[in-house]
Amino acid sequence: MSDVLNKMKTRRSIRKFKSDMVPQEALDQIIEAGLYAASGMGEQSPIIIQVTKKELRDEISKMNCKIGGWKEGFDPFYGAPAMLIVLAKKSRPTYIYDGSLVMGNLMLAAHELGIGSCWIHRAKEEFESDWGKNFLKSLGIEGEYEGIGHCALGYVDGEYPAAPARKENRVFYVK
């Protein structure tokens, strides 16, 4: 089996991270993989925001927690010290798919580099808020973008989870 197929089969969502920061060189490689994701008509509309500043990461975590309805103090990013936020231009008819493909590439690249990842939702709600719109504006990002997801990144704290058995009857063949 090829290395790529093996990585697809063995990548798992991590929900317990060490506090050690992922090196910038590794983050750059992961981001590059995201930038090479397929996109509708090759438009490459998704953008990626890297967040490693602890204060901002914690602020986003609190907002995400509130949106998710959890008790104050819960960290929906499971302690991950780094995150890559994927947004896509709403004017593209394939923007959700394009952003989702970026997320997949980010997670596979992280796994290849020995870095744990987890897709964290609620980016859509975050960036629909005044906070999110002002944050994008502060970065010089203009236009109508929708948050697709956060790719939480860090080193696995504990055992790497095994893949559960695959469900049956999910493929139908027409020959």
Residue ranges and their predicted role:
Residues 1-175:
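Acidic, surface-exposed loops and disordered segments
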